[in-house]
């Protein structure tokens, strides 16, 4: 499979905390999201100036242009975090990085605090995956805890979409062939054995075995998980 890729992770709550502190109206917010999504930070600053946003908010939004990179940018983000909500968003990203470090995935991870969830339904973690040989992300996703409510049921959720055309283009240009028909292994673990489960899964994957891990529910027997 793909060996050269980057997963860019953000937290919509950080961006949203900046919005809340700026006290801008809905129309300005929509335009601001669009500008920052297009990485037009100069235009974003002009918009905030016209909207008479707080100077501290303008400074925080301007800093977003530099909030892209390795785990070290999370420390920089703390310097401009305007609220406890923003700090919690950063702490959440740090926790995710700690788990990914157990997987030894650090080299594939970057952070982008300017991710705003332009569609408006993301509520926390948001991510995109990139590789060379494509013009766009090959995977996009995140949390959308309130989206299902619009269809009649309150249910937290997380999901992602694989952009098949971009993925196939990347595989072709990188001359990668994918075998099919392989069976997958499932590793069940108790909550306190997460690190052991990850290490075992890495051993299996190192032998080209498709492997998934899943925390065992305390009220379920092993038979419940047998296909």
Please report, for each region that a protein language model flagged, where it lies by residue:
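Short acidic, glycine/serine/threonine-rich loops at helix termini
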Residues: 17-22, 122-123
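Acidic, His- and aromatic-enriched active-site or binding-groove loops in soluble protein domains
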Residues: 24-46, 105
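Short, conserved phosphate-binding/catalytic loop or strand-edge motifs used
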Residues: 9-17
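Short acidic alpha-helix initiation/capping motifs at coil-to-helix transition points
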Residues: 8-10, 38-41, 52-55
